[in-house]
């Protein structure tokens, strides 16, 4: 397999500009590419999000094309060499991608080594076998929780270690992942803020 993946836990970390914390990794990932096809379906303001990505990636001399703005999204993916799936709400993202019938094509091209995949937050969730370890509220109902399966395990982005707060009575992130593991015999990678996972073929490297 010749998967090329860069999966960010988050687009932003405290005190840094949008995508700034991962600029070096993103720059290396974008190096062979001239155009970034950007999928902003996880947010409501797709124009604004695409422009924000365009500004953030401007140092890398790439053209950013919003997938939502093209006449035929499937044809655009079939021709693209790099797809960036942005963060936001994972359920909204999955619903849109399923309705456009994009997931099968994306997975096929990534596995064939024809499409590099950059994901952030919700886009990282989408790279997993399922959506079931997202932190997001299910504001819409996708057809299925099945996702791309570009890594053989689940990821929980924005992972937070349990803090000592005696007044907090809700579940911690660790407890919620534990509930998932009660029902599923699957590895879950908790990715802290500012970290990213790089896949080059069969090699996986966690950095940040």
Predicted feature locations:
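N-terminal beta1-alpha1 cap of cysteine-dependent amidohydrolase-like domains
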Residues: 1-86
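Patatin-like phospholipase A catalytic core
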Residues: 2-14, 195-208
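Charged helix-capping and loop-helix junction motifs
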Residues: 20-23, 52, 98-104, 139, ...
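Flexible gly/pro-rich beta->alpha loop and the following alpha-helix that scaffold active-site loops
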Residues: 62-116
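Class I SAM-dependent methyltransferase SAM-binding "motif I" and its flanking Rossmann-like core
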Residues: 94-98, 103-112, 116-166
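Conserved anion/nucleotide-ligand pocket segment
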Residues: 153-196, 200-201, 207
